[in-house]
């Protein structure tokens, strides 16, 4: 079969990791896969799997993105994919409009994956218009049924996200060379117990709560150091706000922003505690939680949503 995976970009994130892992699994089982997304750190894994990557920014919120509808329609006619699997809203609209202009026998099966609690709007409703709709957790299934679909919808499937125990083996420890490189890049972490908060730099990910927790612990534990992993532009307003909050709490020297990383397994295994603090809306699926627990690393998380 020929399967298309469509998403915003190949940056580091939950839905992006899911799309790449599906791609790798499909390729390992002999299927043809095409990924349509803007380039990013995960592109190497797509290429390594043997899949094709079309570096089309179909998730960029600008008028020019609509030009990809006709381009994609022509590509579908020429390449005849069997399935189109979309992982985000704007790519879903581009794919849906491209497919809608085709004859029924030329259309691939249109599958959408609900990776989050999208705002209730006609724009977001595209994620519930798939021939098949996938909810990544029971929490997202309930949210989808409440806001988009009737109580009985035969084509809504709950497929829980998971973590490979081969990729995140229990008791795993980073290599000595990794630790040496870590301390060279971040010398303030040497001989410290790392408290780690990974995830996208977004307000609902709980960064302010993490900083407040770190401040409350500093007087009792002098060997802890907070680390925030996540993609953000240097000097962004949100980063500046968090740095200001850390300064007001007197812990600016005990908190490090390490940016986006592809070695998450090593960071988790090197940490004393990992945090998953999504508040409102809650986490759609706790990928960080499953990876962390698979490694056997203690986790602190809110007991709600998809965690």
Residue locations for each model-derived region?
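A conserved mid-protein helix/loop that constitutes part of the nucleotide-sugar donor-binding site
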Residues: 16-24, 193, 197, 202-219, ...
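A conserved, positively charged/aromatic
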Residues: 104-138, 149-151
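A short, active-site helix/loop in glycosyltransferases that binds the activated sugar's phosphate group
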Residues: 131-170
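Short His-centered aromatic/hydrophobic patch
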Residues: 86-92, 114
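Glycosyltransferase donor-sugar binding loop
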Residues: 36-41, 198, 225-240
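Active-site donor-binding acidic/aromatic loop of nucleotide-activated sugar
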Residues: 234-241, 252-261, 267
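Acidic donor-binding loop of glycosyltransferase active sites
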Residues: 269-284, 297-298
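N-terminal strand-loop element at the rim of the active site
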Residues: 5-67, 150, 154-156, 234, ...
């Amino acid at each position: 079969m020929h399967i298309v995976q469509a998403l915003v970009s190949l940056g580091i994130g939950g839905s992006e990791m899911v799309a790449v892992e599906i791609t790798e699994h499909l390729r390992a089982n002999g299927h043809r896969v095409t990924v349509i997304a803007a380039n990013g750190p995960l592109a190497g894994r797509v290429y390594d799997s043997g899949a094709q990557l079309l570096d089309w920014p179909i998730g960029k919120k600008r008028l020019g993105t609509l030009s990809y509808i006709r381009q994609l329609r022509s590509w579908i006619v020429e390449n005849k994919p069997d399935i189109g699997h979309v992982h985000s809203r704007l790519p879903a609209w581009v794919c849906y409009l491209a497919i809608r202009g085709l004859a029924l026998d030329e259309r691939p099966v249109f599958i959408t994956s609900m990776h989050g609690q999208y705002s209730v709007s006609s724009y977001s409703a595209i994620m519930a218009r798939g021939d098949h709709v996938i909810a990544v957790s029971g929490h997202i299934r309930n949210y989808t049924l409440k806001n988009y679909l009737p109580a009985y919808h035969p084509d809504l499937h709950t497929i829980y996200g998971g973590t490979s125990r081969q990729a995140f083996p229990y008791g795993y420890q980073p290599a000595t060379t990794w630790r040496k490189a870590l301390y060279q890049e971040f010398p303030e972490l040497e001989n410290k117990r790392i408290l780690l908060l990974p995830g996208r730099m977004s307000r609902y990910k709980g960064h302010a709560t993490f900083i407040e927790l770190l401040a409350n612990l500093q007087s009792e534990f002098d060997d802890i150091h907070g680390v925030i992993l996540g993609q953000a532009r240097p000097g962004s307003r949100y980063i500046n706000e968090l740095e200001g909050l850390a300064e007001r709490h007197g812990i600016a020297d005990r908190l490090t922003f390490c940016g986006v990383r592809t070695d998450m397994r090593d960071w988790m295994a090197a940490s004393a505690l990992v945090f998953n603090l999504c508040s409102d809306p809650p986490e759609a699926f706790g990928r960080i939680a499953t990876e962390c627990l698979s490694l056997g690393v203690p986790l602190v998380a809110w007991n709600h949503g998809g965690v």
